[in-house]
Amino acid sequence: MQTETHSDTAVIEIRDLSTRFGDHIVHTGVDLEVRRAEIFALAGGSGSGKSTLLREMILLQRPDSGTIRVLGTDLRTLDEDATRALRRRWGVMFQHGGLFSSLNLLENIGLPLREHTALDAALIDEIAAWKIALIGLAPDTGAQFPAELSGGMQKRASLARALALDPELLFLDEPTAGLDPASAADVDELVCKLRDVFGLTIVMITHDLNLMWRVADRVAVLGAGTVQAIGSMDELSRLGNPAVRVFFEGRRAQVPRERAPRPAMESAWKPK
């Protein structure tokens, strides 16, 4: 297991984390660190604890022992007000979107603003419309309901909602799952732009090797309850660890892909 040392630029620090459900051990002695303004991927087989670790980082579940610090705050020390304040500083895009079917897109994106701010309805709608433009959807999409959107559009809409509060930190759960190759490539580009233009720190769970090769600065491979290795995809592809090699087997992964160049910073992405 690779253990990282403390860094002043760390946005997330996890130390000696252990989690169990009854007799089933999910994590034991997990250590990892996510650096500011990097795209960090969590990989591993089914049951390796990726989703549980994500839930612990976003305060949906508590580990049995160990520490998690997010944006400089020890998650064990939070009261209700501090929890609410910290949650305002990150956004989450869940695997299945989590859009409310009874609300149109503009209303869905505006929900975090209604929950966490005292802004008036007109300003909330204006911000939501800007987020729609930001993630590359047409303005009239705001009046549509989730059932009227394609899978790729729903992913973008979920991402727009995660960005509603202008977070410093973004969590993505399987952002390309269920998408066709063209839509998945669009998500790749979008993730890069969010980091490069806005300086977001991005943590993602993914099984998509193409996404990891294209956008991840570093990847942590989980297995047997712990972190098997952390490094760039190039570094991981050269390791002999069987728990890591499984991600580089098969026809699709036999030839390592070169990291795709960062997309050009289009003027529409420049902060106003």
Task: Name every feature range the model reports, one short phrase each.
Residues 58:
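Helix-to-loop junction immediately C-terminal to a conserved catalytic motif
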Residues 43-45:
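The feature captures the beta-strand-to-loop junction immediately N-terminal to the Walker
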Residues 74, 121-140:
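Conserved ABC ATPase "signature" region
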Residues 145-149, 153:
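Conserved ABC ATPase signature
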Residues 166:
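Conserved catalytic motifs of ABC-family nucleotide-binding domains
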Residues 170-173:
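Catalytic Walker B motif of ABC-type/P-loop ATPase nucleotide-binding domains
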